[in-house]
């Protein structure tokens, strides 16, 4: 058996909610600080590594998702993975005219360091960096994510800060898996 490693902790995530507006609308957020370094290091992607049945029962390996459409070998797009509102379930509703999804994906996981057993100053810095990672993933989704058909970006995805009650649209607290 391998000895325990107290430094080996899971990533944590600031989730965010988006509303899918009509194609052609533009709601892209400004490029956040350190965007390029986080985009390349994460990397921001629709490709995820699976661990034999943890997600939908597939085998260990890599799965290439699409944003909105179902890709071969997947159960749906990233958008439907944590969709909160499917507007087709509310015909005629003025409150739920558009789909709303909460984004919790490897692209917005912060895995650079832990906030467990850190000083308050170190925790605050790591939490701020984690927010930048999530805002960077949102910016990537709106500007660079591959679209089925060969184009890039989904600028019609509108942040919904009102749903979490925060000015930046991120959850008030990170999702911590430990």
Which stretches of residues belong to each language-model region?
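Flavin (FAD/FMN)-binding glycine-rich loop and adjacent Rossmann-like elements that form
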Residues: 1-178
């Amino acid at each position: 058996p391998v000895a325990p490693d107290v430094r080996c902790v899971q990533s944590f995530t600031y989730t965010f909610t988006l509303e899918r507006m009509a194609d052609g609308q533009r709601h892209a957020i400004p490029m956040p600080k350190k965007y390029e370094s986080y985009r390349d290091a994460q990397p921001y992607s629709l490709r995820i590594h699976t661990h034999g049945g943890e997600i939908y029962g597939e085998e260990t390996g890599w799965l290439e998702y699409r944003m909105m459409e179902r890709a071969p070998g997947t159960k749906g797009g990233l958008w439907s993975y944590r969709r909160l509102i499917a507007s087709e379930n509310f015909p005629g509703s003025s409150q739920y005219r558009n789909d709303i999804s909460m984004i919790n994906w490897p692209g917005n996981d912060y895995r650079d360091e832990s906030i467990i057993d850190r000083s308050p100053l170190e925790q605050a810095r790591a939490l701020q960096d984690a927010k930048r990672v999530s805002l960077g993933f949102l910016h990537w989704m709106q500007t660079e994510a591959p679209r089925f058909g060969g184009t890039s970006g989904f600028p019609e995805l509108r942040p919904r800060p009102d749903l979490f009650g925060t000015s930046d649209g991120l959850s008030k607290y990170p999702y911590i898996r430990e």
